[in-house]
Amino acid sequence: AWAAVALGYTTTQASGLVGVVAIGTAAGALAASVIMKLDRATGVIPLGIGMGLLVIGMIAIHDVRVAAPFLALLGGLGGYLVVPMNALLQHRGHNLMGAGRSIAVQNFNEQACILGLGAFYAGMTRFGLSAFGAITVFGLAVAGTMELIRRWHARNRVRHQDEVERLLAIARSDKH
């Protein structure tokens, strides 16, 4: 809907922008796989807050020459965020329930979130919110959720310091 309103794109033209996001995501994921270490994975949480706020910037973009690099940047941030978060979830899940079950639970939750966010967006537009309004609400929801996760993690580092340090020691010692 955004590409149609902001850029005057058809669905077919807008599908090319998905490819731009995918290229950015792949580049960000590759960078994260080289740069990030498991014991520092939670350090990317602020990127999620930034991504949510950056998404709101889409409402000011009306030129594909600006949109394409912007969407590639968003994809890059997403790729850089998701690799360490997935690695952390899989590592913790492996220690709790085994690798196969951990990955299955993680994939289920990811797909459920995709479905839920799609329904959230569809609901907003169905009840008359413009594409720009829905993007703003979505961006604020992502940034707000990531801020809650950041605070929860900070609280856990204080309340459960010994357990967090134990888990970090395991993460530092694992060589995968």
Description of each model-found segment:
Residues 29, 70-121:
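Substrate-agnostic recognition of the 12-TM MFS/MFS-like secondary transporter fold
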Residues 27-41, 125:
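Helix-to-loop junctions at the C-terminal end of transmembrane segments
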Residues 11-19, 100, 104, 135:
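Small-residue hotspots at the loop-to-helix junctions and early N-terminal turns
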Residues 16-25, 106, 110, 141:
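Transmembrane alpha-helical segments of major facilitator superfamily
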Residues 58-59, 137-172:
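Multi-pass alpha-helical transporter architecture, strongest
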Residues 1-13:
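Short amphipathic helix-loop junctions that connect adjacent transmembrane helices
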Residues 49-63:
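C-terminal ends and interior cores of transmembrane alpha-helices
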Residues 10-13, 42, 119-143:
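A membrane-interface helix-boundary motif in multi-pass transporters
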